């Protein structure tokens, strides 16, 4: 996954760019330097054993995308506080949508849970945060976006590797080149996997021979659960709780690096917002103050850390947990 950017989906909605073959009259003409760069990419792909036919077809959809560079370099006008972000993302409509989607897919979610040990509510919550339950997957040609970022982006070598991974996905027949669409940064499908993440963690849950995270919900849910399980998810635990801390709380005790038993936190004056804290929830927890003392506070467990291995953002991980809680209360 790419680092979480709260405005990413808004940017995608405001500036969609459909994949077009280079032969199209609407295609952006690439300069000679970019064409030379593509020749090197082609050699690399063939050297890695990707079939020439796959490379030829994929490169028909590769063009330089100036908008991708603009988005990569854009600085947000306003970085949302934790409280602002949670209010925006964990809203009543998203909770309602999450409950409805959980109910509509409950049988499939239970089968995924039995195989991977990840609770259905967390699968649905992650699906909702990543792609609004599959509705916002991005409309950029992934090969074109990755080639553009490899050529002129801030992390060229990384994106070059991601492009090679994307070509391997095409070579394995999981998706057609004209259907490999995603975000401007190359995150794909309903779970927004980068190509390298796809190769490592996407699964063919329904056994049809393809790992289809674009249209097949069985593969989407299975891939989300497999990834979380591989990241250390504990199926008998939750993610954390929103809590209240006293006004004189020592903030030096907060942070993911500080772990204490729940009893210790309670003796320090930490209190749950909602149901009381119990020793059943987890052996150790960390206290987070994303907006500082006086803002919202979280007591988080190991599953929160697993979610942050998916995406290194406290806001992201907390939103997943809170939406999952909303499903459970439904």
Residue ranges and their predicted role:
Residues 249-330:
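C-terminal soluble interaction/assembly domains
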